[in-house]
Amino acid sequence: MARIAGVDLPNKHVSVALTYIYGISRSSARTICEKARISSACLINDLSQDELAVVRAIIDREYKVEGRLRTEVALNIKRLMDIGCYRGLRHRKGLPVRGQRTRTNARTRKGKRKTVAGKKK
């Protein structure tokens, strides 16, 4: 089992296995395979140590992955909250950020329903 960027990759096609790394999509994985001159249909366990080293070097040099990427995203959200912009306020309140409706739906972002007492007749 190969280990790249602190992630154990399963024995699948290279282009699929690389997507197990946070920050690498299918298209990024294909690009990495092309730059490393590796067939994306090849299995991870079939790669030599030299080929794995080339893939590691490409990822380290050109991509922000795993911890570095998670930290950057968290800092971007924190910056939005600190400057008090609309998106930052929505993050702070735990509401949808990108303009979705909230009268109904938005349960994923808002969490479990809170029961409100009904109006007396």
UniProtKB/Swiss-Prot annotation:
It holds the Pfam family Ribosomal_S13. Keywords: Ribonucleoprotein, Ribosomal protein, RNA-binding, rRNA-binding, tRNA-binding. Residues 94-121 are annotated as: Disordered. InterPro entries: Rbsml_uS13_C, Ribosomal_uS13, Ribosomal_uS13-like_H2TH, Ribosomal_uS13_bac-type, Ribosomal_uS13_CS. GO terms for cellular component: cytosol; small ribosomal subunit. GO terms for biological process: translation. It comes from the Bacteria. GO terms for molecular function: rRNA binding; structural constituent of ribosome; tRNA binding. SUPFAM superfamilies: S13-like H2TH domain. Belongs to the universal ribosomal protein uS13 family. Part of the 30S ribosomal subunit. Forms a loose heterodimer with protein S19. Forms two bridges to the 50S subunit in the 70S ribosome. Located at the top of the head of the 30S subunit, it contacts several helices of the 16S rRNA. In the 70S ribosome it contacts the 23S rRNA (bridge B1a) and protein L5 of the 50S subunit (bridge B1b), connecting the 2 subunits; these bridges are implicated in subunit movement. Contacts the tRNAs in the A and P-sites. This is Small ribosomal subunit protein uS13. It comes from Treponema pallidum (strain Nichols).
